[in-house]
């Protein structure tokens, strides 16, 4: 039984774990992508970056911005509390 657990853990580490998170997709300078409600722009942008879906949502301090669901870790998201540096 212990061997089965050890082999399972070894396979998990060898294969790797892909994680995803939800958030406002951001440009490299921590600026959000602005959007128009009910337009397909956010969903398209999010899906192009590996998310499962996206929508236009309100973010205090930034206005309307694209919110992505299940965005990969390698895609930047808005860091709340940090300013957009243009």
From Swiss-Prot:
Example of a GO biological process term: defense response
Regarding tissue, the record states: Expressed by the venom gland.
Q: How is it modified after translation?
A: The C-terminal basic residue is removed by a carboxypeptidase.
Give the matching InterPro entries. LCN-type_CS_alpha_beta_dom, Scorpion_toxin-like, Scorpion_toxin-like_sf, Scorpion_toxinL, Scorpion_toxinL/defensin
Would I find Signal among this entry's keywords?
yes
Q: Where is the secretion signal located? A: 1-19
Which domain of life does the protein's organism represent?
A: Eukaryota
- Paired cysteines (S-S): 31-84, 35-56, 42-66, 46-68
Under the heading SMART domains, the entry gives: Knot1
Give GO cellular component annotations, separated by semicolons: extracellular region
Please state what the protein is called: Toxin Aam3
What does the record give as the organism's lineage? Eukaryota, Metazoa, Ecdysozoa, Arthropoda, Chelicerata
Q: Does the keyword Signal apply?
A: yes
Family statement drawn from the similarity comment of this UniProt entry: Belongs to the long (4 C-C) scorpion toxin superfamily. Sodium channel inhibitor family. Alpha subfamily.
Q: Which organism is it from?
A: Androctonus amoreuxi
- Supply the alphabetized keyword list: Disulfide bond, Ion channel impairing toxin, Neurotoxin, Secreted, Signal, Toxin, Voltage-gated sodium channel impairing toxin
GO MF annotation terms: sodium channel inhibitor activity; toxin activity
Biological function: Alpha toxins bind voltage-independently at site-3 of sodium channels (Nav) and inhibit the inactivation of the activated channels, thereby blocking neuronal transmission.
